[in-house]
């Protein structure tokens, strides 16, 4: 998440949950009470959250037409979404408990034996939550960005799909499913 305030830019990698509400919904998150994002809160007007989907390096050798002509260069294919809105900090123990439970559930639900907060000492969890401050970002603007070699020929895109589907690097197979031959 990128925040600008008091002439400084603050960039943080934070776990966020999408929550229904307003036109585009809201993003819910939390930081420690000593975190710069919270300390600079009053000077921050808007924030931008960036969600990156699968992305991958594209070898020039994978382009059929370019390989023949020798007129090719490496590329990068990607899909991303930017969500922008106003941030509001929430100092509420009940909200924080519900938020942390929802965040944990979103990460644990697909596990064979998911962990839940009922397995932890309630006093310990309360002490952890007390050191955190919640926030919500009311999403006012969404912007999707993609580059999937759409300017290439159908033969080139089909070749990319085949190569990416066999590429062991993270995200390559998922990206192959997004490219339209």
Language model regions located:
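Binding-site signature for planar aromatic cofactors or substrates
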Residues: 1-181
């Amino acid at each position: 998440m990128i925040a600008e305030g008091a002439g400084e830019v603050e960039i943080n990698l934070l776990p966020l949950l999408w929550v229904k509400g307003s036109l585009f919904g809201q993003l819910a998150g939390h930081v420690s009470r000593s975190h710069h994002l919270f300390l600079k809160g009053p000077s921050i007007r808007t924030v931008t959250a960036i969600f990156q989907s699968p992305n991958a390096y594209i070898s020039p050798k994978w382009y059929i037409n370019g390989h023949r002509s020798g007129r090719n260069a490496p590329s990068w294919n990607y899909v991303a979404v930017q969500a922008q809105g106003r941030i509001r900090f929430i100092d509420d123990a009940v909200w924080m408990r519900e938020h942390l439970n929802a965040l944990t559930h979103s990460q644990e639900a697909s596990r064979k034996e998911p962990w839940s907060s009922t397995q932890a000492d309630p006093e310990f969890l309360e002490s952890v939550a007390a050191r955190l401050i919640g926030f919500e970002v009311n999403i006012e603007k969404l912007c999707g960005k993609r580059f999937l070699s759409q300017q290439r020929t159908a033969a080139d895109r089909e070749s990319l799909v085949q190569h990416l589907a066999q590429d062991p690097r993270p995200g390559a197979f998922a990206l192959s499913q997004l490219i339209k031959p």
